[in-house]
């Protein structure tokens, strides 16, 4: 498994618990898009996990915050190298990235409240300590699913069953979890000539 963590904020830092103790892991912390590209080419077909802040265009790179280099660590530019592998995409609006690229397969978060500012922006009354605790619990739950080799298609339902859904922002986060399978192009068969059906 390849793990990419863009660890530039306190809430993103909590996501290191997702891969803690996972065996046979290639870890890239704050990589450039080129570094991600190189590792994807070296390890075709290997599951890729991406974590941090993002949008429907991809996982935001450290360079977005510094103003030096491309703003995206994983995004449209990598799409050909993302198609033939399973993905675990944990960033805000990762599901939008998958919607734009229907050939992708994996587990995707939607908007995911991970700090007090995001909670306020979406009208939730929640404190940073509680939010950080919930992010940590989410990371630990995902870690367990990885170690148990649970099929990605089962993740959303399992995670919802473990969450404190009575908290409005937690329910918002977990309701947005999705598994997306590949959308295969329909193979339109030529109709058989008359009289060939027996």
Segments from the language model and where they lie:
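Short, low-complexity, polar/charged sequence segments that are solvent-exposed and flexible
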Residues: 22-24, 45-48, 67-69, 106-110, ...
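Short acidic, S/G/P-rich loop/turn micro-motifs used as interaction or catalytic elements
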Residues: 9-14, 32-35, 53-62, 93-97, ...
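Active-site-proximal C-terminal subdomain of hydrolase catalytic domains
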Residues: 86-198
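Short, surface-exposed basic-aromatic patches at helix termini and helix-loop junctions that form
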Residues: 20-21, 41-45, 78-82, 98-109
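A domain-level signal for caspase-like cysteine endopeptidase catalytic cores
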Residues: 1-51, 86-90
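A short, glycine/acidic-enriched catalytic loop
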Residues: 55-83
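A diffuse structural propensity rather than consistent per-protein peaks
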Residues: 32, 72-75, 151
